[in-house]
Design a protein with these regions (language model features):
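C-terminal outer-membrane/trafficking sorting elements
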Residues: 232-271
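Serine/threonine-rich, low-complexity intrinsically disordered segments
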Residues: 5, 26, 169, 225, ...
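C-terminal segment of classical bacterial N-terminal signal peptides
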Residues: 17-27
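A composition-driven surface/loop motif
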Residues: 27-227
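A composition/secondary-structure signal for short, hydrophobic, low-basic-content segments
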Residues: 1, 23-25, 246
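Generic N-terminal leader/processing signal
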Residues: 6, 17, 98, 259, ...
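Bacterial N-terminal signal peptides that target proteins for export
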Residues: 2-14
Length: 271
């Protein structure tokens, strides 16, 4: 009897534990609106996205700062789908060192909400058939980094060109879209701390919604160089009249005071 009671007690306790376990909801993982090689980023995998097939190197996502970090990373999805697809508002794509993002029949980087590419490194985005970087009805900023975008279709592109804004700030960019355009389908292009250097004479054409030359969109060899502001440097005349002049241009008689000479000498040393 004692054994029977003991077994019943153990059975009852086991049943109670099982019921408690069943009634306690499992901790659900959080899903984020960003996909890498077709796999959605979650609270479980965001700390190491190299677990996704097609991803190598260091790839992480910080949901607190909405930052996707690539460091010496290769993301290659192969035939179908986008290498990186994002619906996150104000996503930051931080590139450290050199990173390669490639696909075949879709966009290497596809965004539906504003994105800033930054981090001081290099992003090589390549699509064999479609878009290297596709800003679908949204704004794209490239800031303090290097971006090389190439595709047989579109290089860096918006969608309709009605509202999409492309801002390139203190960055170096090369892009080509062999069939459609290197930079196209944008409402505006803003360059800060950099200059469109190739092809010579190319500029943003609002009527074509892209960078154009001679009335046609540039498709190959478009280069934006960092650190050239386009401000002309003043030319100093070597035949300026000798003497001492006021700010109004009147010539003074006598020699320059010693204090003034000392100030000029100091200024020359600083320059």
């Amino acid at each position: 009897m004692k054994t029977s009671h003991r077994l019943k007690l153990v059975g009852l306790l086991s049943w109670c534990i099982a019921m408690i376990a069943l009634s306690t909801p499992a901790q659900a993982q959080t899903e984020y609106d960003i996909w890498i090689c077709g796999t959605q980023v979650t609270s479980e995998n965001c700390g190491d996205l190299s677990v996704i097939e097609g991803v190598n190197g260091t790839v992480t996502y910080d949901p607190t700062t909405k930052t996707l970090t690539l460091q010496r990373a290769t993301i290659n999805i192969g035939e179908e789908g986008q290498a990186i697809y994002s619906e996150i508002n104000d996503l930051i794509l931080k590139v450290i060192d050199t990173n390669n993002v490639t696909t075949v029949k879709a966009s290497a980087l596809f965004i539906t909400k504003p994105l800033t590419i930054t981090g001081g490194g290099t992003l090589n985005a390549k699509s064999q058939d479609f878009c290297a970087i596709y800003a679908w009805g949204t704004d794209l900023t490239i800031d303090d980094c290097t971006v090389n975008a190439s595709s047989a279709g579109y290089g860096i592109t918006g969608d309709s060109g009605e509202s999409e804004k492309l801002t390139i700030r203190n960055a170096a960019v090369t892009t080509e879209g062999e069939q459609e355009g290197a930079i196209c389908n944008f409402h505006s292009l803003t360059l800060e701390g950099c200059t469109l250097t190739q092809p010579a004479g190319a500029a943003f054409d609002a009527s074509l919604n892209g960078v154009a030359l001679n009335g046609e969109l540039v498709k190959r060899g478009l280069t934006i160089a960092k650190g050239t502001s386009g401000i002309l440097q003043p030319t100093i005349s070597t035949t300026a009249p000798k003497g001492i002049y006021t700010l109004n241009g009147q010539k003074l008689r006598g020699s320059l005071p010693a204090q003034a000479k000392a100030c000029i000498s100091s200024a020359e040393r600083k320059s």
